[in-house]
Amino acid sequence: MKENEKVIMEKGIHTDFKENMTYGEYLQLDSLLSSQQRLSDHHDEMLFIVIHQASELWMKLILHELNAAIESIKQDKLPPAFKMLARVSKIQSQIIQSWDILATLTPSEYIEFRDSLGQASGFQSYQYRMIEYALGYKTPHALKIYEKDPELHARLHKALHTPSLYDVAIQALVKEGFPIHKDVLNRDITQPYEEDATVEAAWIEVYADVQKYWDLYQLAEKLIDIEDWLQQWRFRHMKTVERIIGHKMGTGGSSGVSYLKRVLDQCFFPELWNVRTKL
């Protein structure tokens, strides 16, 4: 046996899988790798599909971690939530890098298969919508997009009516004794969050006495990390779209780059950003 074969077939490596589960079976690779179905004959459509499918897989993990973190905070278990939220930030940094790959798609290449998408658009990503809901940016009107699939619509409806990460963070402030206005605590959580002076005052106190409120301080910084990464993702999204299609209308009917620029102004945790100025 050649030396390189000895390395590859090291004694103890399993080779008989007649009655054992394989790597491919565990990951269901046959199903996963057969889901890249091009609707055109253009070579670069495969890139477009893989980038978006990979992003959806990462978003699935983000939701998994965000939902677990929300439950952990609700149960007053903040330190475990920190690990989950830190992982979310790492995933976000990974997704941002995917724009570098998609940016290798030129306008001349994309135009060859863009019509194959019809009205399909990333705007319709239900997982991205659920991430926004989990972070507190609630948009009830967006549910109409998902009426075609009753089961999916029900999931999004549930997410819309579920307390967000920022909702439970504010509850953590209340449990620590901070006087949060009743209008904040009794607000309609299906609507976008609006900043409040009592919430801002609480966070200012947290940042002014880090040692006393260490866990709340750590929570606040984890939230800032997530929004920071999300805004970087949004910016790269906008610039990549501009690079590929310029200022054309999006396939989903939006104004394209103009819409994506407006989205950059959406803020999830306004008081945590205000604190930077007020300290």
UniProtKB/Swiss-Prot annotation:
Cofactor field: heme
Pfam families given in the database record: Trp_dioxygenase (PF03301)
Residues annotated as binding heme: H237
Reactions catalysed, as given in the entry: L-tryptophan + O2 = N-formyl-L-kynurenine
The EC number(s) this enzyme carries: 1.13.11.11
Example of a GO biological process term: L-tryptophan catabolic process to acetyl-CoA
Binding-site residues for substrate, renumbered to this chain: F48, I49, V50, I51, H52, Y110, R114, T251
Pathway info: Amino-acid degradation; L-tryptophan degradation via kynurenine pathway; L-kynurenine from L-tryptophan: step 1/2
InterPro entries: Trp/Indoleamine_2_3_dOase-like (IPR037217), Trp_2-3-dOase_bac (IPR017485), Trp_2_3_dOase (IPR004981)
Keywords: Dioxygenase, Heme, Iron, Metal-binding, Oxidoreductase, Tryptophan catabolism
GO MF terms held by the record: heme binding; metal ion binding; tryptophan 2,3-dioxygenase activity
Stored Gene3D superfamilies: 1.20.58.480
Similarity comment: Belongs to the tryptophan 2,3-dioxygenase family.
Complexes and interactors: Homotetramer.
HAMAP family reported for this sequence: T23O
Protein name according to UniProt: Tryptophan 2,3-dioxygenase
Source organism of the structure: Bacillus mycoides (strain KBAB4) (Bacillus weihenstephanensis)
